[in-house]
A protein has these predicted regions:
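Ankyrin-repeat and related helical/solenoid repeat scaffolds used for protein-protein interactions
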Residues: 421, 433, 456, 468, ...
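N-terminal targeting peptides
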Residues: 1-82, 93-96, 102-113, 117, ...
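Pentatricopeptide repeat
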Residues: 20-25, 29, 40, 56-61, ...
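Inter-helix linker motif
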Residues: 16, 51-52, 87, 122, ...
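Methionine-biased hydrophobic packing positions in alpha-helices, especially
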Residues: 47-48, 83-86, 118-121, 153, ...
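Acidic, glycine-centered low-complexity repeats within long intrinsically disordered regions
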Residues: 35, 50-52, 122, 155, ...
């Protein structure tokens, strides 16, 4: 630090004063280059006054530069106030440096205020100051203000340059505003401002965030055509854009083209490609590129492992998913809740509920990873698929509260489905009824699973009641909901209700499927309405639906009950199965003329 020499008097000779001032300036400038802002401020505020030196503009601006380099916007603003208090008017450099300090921290309000103060100090905002303010707005998520500042620069007689445009395009990229970003990129060329790699990269990333993979790739190709030298960031953004839109083939092509462009793929390149393959369940390719990381001298990180585990999960490769999860500690990679959630989900898809529970309740806690909604929901769903309704309820009602995890709609839906599959309609009804009290809004899936549970237990009144509640809750019933209620009424002998609900589906613009028709045909069979059964079964091919073994069996029974033996013989003679399974579809041969003739006398079920 700069100190006064021993034996000095109360006043310094003019040349000594100049020497000390030069030394102080040099020291502050050195601190500024190293971003040592505290040392610079201490020298400015303490040591210079102790040497009876009044800090001048150069010393203040150097100290402001130290704050800017360290991203310390608050001390920078305080220094400006100090200058005003000393009647030392800040100049354009002072303001520009302070605004730049704000830009790095996204303090756009303070940056705008400082720019607004400049005219009151008879200072005109310059290119550096305005570009820094644009950058501050971008960092603060204020892309509209950034664009306004850029467009307002000519009014202040300031011509935007490459830095100004890049700051604005970067602001648009952070806001996923791909259209204005493309527009500014074109405008740069029109204004004879040559876009650089930063301009193109920000535009590619903006398109990627806006899921515009074609435009991302187009901009990348434009870079190559104009010799703008794309780098790994350019390719990584384009690969990510393709991956987000499930264009995994193009992601792979871009990765493999990087060496030809003399660009070495980095870990981000590989991770983005693995993620692209993961989204489409291309687990073999994901494994290939994961294995390519060490061959390229790169170490897989948490993102790499999470992507490959998720790829295995989507590809039904639960053993591989668990293998990669177990490898993470040896690779010195910390598994996260994402890693475990993907592995648990892999076990869930394979109905390996014991493994799912072991991961959730044992291994996660042993590795110090806190379970979350995703991991708990996957475990509940694993229990549902494994027929373990008691364990599903235990996770929802006991373990999640202990873990301080609030169940959401997916948690309840999985538990209700578990109860439905376990013929536990009472629990399904209770869970659905409890959801609003816990601040969870039942969805169409919640209602459908509960209605299905009631249908399986023969509680047609409850099924019908929940269908009504569903409408009251403004949850749109689906074909699944209606199928369950129609089937419930049909099985309980409520054939009029079953047929009435079936007809309502058309009014609600719901498309009946094979299940809907089979339930309606079953209602006709129970009520001996053979004409209606025939009309329904002949209607199915018109909707691109083929009757299956159940449809034919129910219609045949309806004919038998009504003593329609000639019709039955003709009907069966005109049908043949497609395939060998009893659930296979059936179709009619041209010889079924009697069945078609009888259809003319059949009526719409009522």
């Amino acid at each position: 630090m700069v100190t006064a020499g021993r034996g000095e008097g109360t006043s310094l000779e003019p040349h000594r004063c100049r020497d000390e001032r030069h030394r102080c300036r040099a020291a502050i400038d050195k601190f500024a280059r190293g971003a040592h802002w505290q040392e610079a401020i201490s020298l400015l505020r303490c040591e210079m006054p102790s040497l009876r030196l009044s800090p001048d503009m150069i010393a203040y601006n150097s100290t402001l530069n130290a704050c800017k380099r360290a991203g310390q916007w608050q001390p920078a603003i305080a220094l400006l106030s100090d200058m005003l208090g000393m009647t030392l008017a800040p100049d354009a450099i002072s303001y520009s440096t302070a605004v730049s300090s704000c830009s790095r921290s996204g303090q756009w309000q303070h940056a705008l205020r400082l720019v607004g103060e400049m005219p009151t100090m008879t200072l005109a905002p310059n290119l550096i100051c305005l570009s820094a303010c644009i950058s501050a707005c971008g960092q603060g998520g204020q892309w509209q203000l950034a664009v306004d500042l850029l467009h307002g620069m000519p009014c202040l007689r300031v011509t935007p340059n490459q830095i100004s445009y890049n700051a604005t395009i970067s602001a648009l990229e952070k806001g996923s505003q791909w259209q204005p970003a493309l527009s500014l990129l074109s405008q740069m060329r029109e204004m004879s401002t040559i876009p650089d790699t930063i301009s193109y990269n920000a535009t590619i990333s903006a398109c990627a965030k806006g899921r515009q993979w074609q435009r991302s790739v187009d901009v990348l190709h434009t870079m190559t055509f104009l010799r703008a030298e794309p780098n790994e960031i350019s390719y990584n953004s384009a690969i990510t854009a393709c991956g987000r839109s499930a264009e995994w083939q193009l992601s792979v092509t871009l990765l493999e083209s990087m060496p030809r462009a003399r660009i070495a793929p980095d870990r981000i390149s590989y991770n983005a490609t693995i993620s692209a393959c993961e989204k489409r369940g291309r687990w073999q390719l994901a494994l290939h590129f994961f294995g390519a990381l060490p061959n390229s001298g790169l170490t897989p990180n948490e993102i790499s492992y999470n992507a490959v585990i998720s790829a295995c999960e989507k590809g039904g490769q639960w053993q591989l998913a668990l293998k990669f999860l177990s490898e993470m500690p040896r690779a010195r990679v910390m598994a996260s809740e994402i890693s475990f959630s993907a592995a648990i989900s892999a076990c869930e898809k394979a109905a390996r509920w014991q493994l799912a529970l072991s991961l959730l309740l044992e291994e996660m806690l042993e590795r110090g990873v806190a379970p979350n909604n995703f991991s708990c929901n996957a475990a509940i769903s694993a229990c549902e698929k494994g027929g373990q309704w008691q364990m599903a309820l235990c996770l929802l009602l006991t373990q999640m509260p202990v873990l301080r995890i609030t169940p959401n709609e997916i948690s309840f839906n999985a538990a209700i489905s578990a109860c439905e599959k376990g013929d536990q309609w009472e629990y399904a009804v209770c869970l659905l009824s409890e959801m609003p009290a816990l601040g969870v809004t039942p969805s169409e899936v919640s209602f459908s699973a509960t209605i299905s549970a009631c249908e399986m237990s023969g509680n047609w009144q409850l099924a019908l009641d929940f269908l009504g509640r569903m409408r009251a809750a403004r949850s749109t019933p689906s074909e699944i909901s209606y199928n369950a209620v129609v089937s419930s009424c049909e099985k309980s002998g409520q054939w009029q209700l079953a047929l009435g609900l079936f007809n309502t589906m058309h009014d609600l613009k719901l498309t009946p499927d094979e299940v809907s028709y089979n339930a309606a045909i079953g209602a006709c069979e129970r009520s001996s309405h053979w004409q209606a059964a025939l009309a329904l079964i002949l209607k199915m091919p018109q909707l691109s639906l083929q009757p299956n073994e159940i449809s034919v069996s129910l219609a045949s029974t309806a004919f038998q009950r009504c003593g329609q033996w000639p019709l039955l013989q003709s009907f069966l003679g005109g049908t043949r199965p497609i395939g060998d399974s009893p659930r296979d579809q059936w179709t009619w041969t041209p010889g079924s003329s009697l069945a078609l003739h009888c259809a003319t006398s059949a009526h719409r079920p009522t």
